Amino acid sequence: AIAAAMAPPGQVATLILPADCSWNESANPAPKPESARPTSVAQKTIEQVAKVLRRGKPSVILLAGSVMLEKGLWLAGRIARASGARIIGQRVNGRTQRGTGRAVIERLPYPVKPALEMLKGTAHLILVGAKPPVSFFAWPNMPNWLTPKDCQIHTLAEGDQGGIEALEILADLLNAPSEPERLYELRIPPLPTGELTAGKVWQALAALIPAEAIISDEGITSSRDAEKWISGTPPHDWLNITGGAIGQGMPVATGAAVACPDRKVFAMQADGSGMYTLQSLWTQAREKLDVVSIIFSNRAYRILLGELKRVGVKEVGPKAGDMFSLSNPEINWVQLAEGMGVHAMRADTCEQFNKYLEASIRSPGPHLIEAVIFE
């Protein structure tokens, strides 16, 4: 089961045991299994992709999986510089390494219109661990396929193949320069002031975040300004929501803190999604994990209201609106957190939030800040 779970690109393993394992004598412990290694990409495949890139037509290299870490992004950035191609990250990725000194990468947007605009004019799409881009849902009068009709799609590496190795060989074939053209530069913003908004929460984090932090991002609609503020901060790991289910933000932050006890972890959590797995706070308290949970308290399932508009609903009636409201009654995140043993604060101004965030970074966690945002 361990070997299956560790197999690239990461799997889910279910272990079924007979009941008598609980009381019968067992044999000696099983030896630690060897982790499966990614299979190599055929040389011919890499040469074909190199040939495509040498043509100089508008090309996009779409990345996902292990190539979203520092080495893979660096290699992709070198290839982009040599070929003129753009590098874009798949919309959802389990882990991305970003920040100062790392290669700049765009991310495919969730809404269809901006995604279509990003890929407009693309003649060749090269997949490295990624899947062909399609819309997340079916929406009226919107295409499901996000690439232009005449775009040719090429697969350099599947998810279970050695994408890093393939990029290294491709960079050599293209005589790529030693470093990417675009690297994230250090841009530390001033602390925000006044009324607290989701964007200002991210601005405050960008001003104060320590190097090598880990961000578990399930801010949903409140994370729209995240990249604008965070990309120029010191190096950090970004753990994205990986699909359509909600509730992964705090459990992922908990796991990251267990795995990396020497790094500060930030759980950027939408309030509606957080209600699914708030028991993570108890685990954080029990294990004394260094996690700062920041709750975007807009008191609504804002993403679902957006989906209503996308399917053509122009006016939301009182009954439907009440289904998406989190204000009847209002959820008291401070009391919820303290009931689970986590030190908690509520902020509704930037000045309060800045103060609480700075204190939470200085002091080992866990901590929770409920950011009551106005938007």
Language-model segments: what does each one mean?
Residues 65-156, 233-263, 275-279, 310, ...:
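Glycine-rich, anion-gripping cofactor-binding loops and their flanking helix/strand elements
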